[in-house]
Amino acid sequence: MSTNTVDGSTKNKEMETVLLDLIKTLEDSQKGFADIGDHLKDISLKRFFLAESLKRANFRAELENELHRAGMADVKEGGTVAGAIHRTWGDLKAKLGGDDHGLLETAEQGEDEAKKAYKDALDEELPLPIRQLLSEQQAHILTSHDFVRSHRDALVTK
């Protein structure tokens, strides 16, 4: 077996791990946006959260397509344990009378996790087309994070 084959398969395995981790994060994010959106009172925020949930589903599908194109793992649904805990916390806040500010705070925490996941992924050695895709997705996530934060902050000043 040549060294190049080992290096190539190692790089493929690393890419697979990075993409699978991001897919789990995106699944958490998709569910989080949908769950929080269900509890928000502001209609325009509800629409934004539904759109973001759908966008995260699209991001996830793009990454799954890259895995399939490279002949790698099938993705199993599930998300992360941290994501499940975070969503449960958001649901509990909503059920205990959480206002939109508190829900946006929870959403921003989730977006902080997504930002970190993308930063960590882009710190890895990945093929250029994958890096470009992740950079585009990351740019959207940063914009979304800033939108959530600015609306959360605006609710404090009202």
Question: What is each of the regions a protein language model found here?
Answer:
Residues E16, I23, E27-Q30, S53, ...:
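Generic structural concept
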Residues A107-K158:
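Preference for long, well-ordered alpha-helical segments
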Residues E14-L22, I43-A61, D100-L104, P129-T143:
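Alpha-helical scaffold segments that form or flank carboxylate-/histidine-based iron centers
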Residues D7-K41, D100-E125:
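Alpha-helical bundle segments that constitute or directly flank the non-heme di-iron/ferroxidase center
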Residues M1-K24, H68-R69, G78, I85-R87, ...:
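N-terminal/domain-start segments enriched in small and hydrophobic, helix-friendly residues
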Residues L45-V81, V148-H151:
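Conserved alpha-helical segments that form or flank metal/cofactor-binding pockets of metalloenzymes
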Residues E62-K115:
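Carboxylate-rich helix-loop segments that flank metal/cofactor sites and access channels
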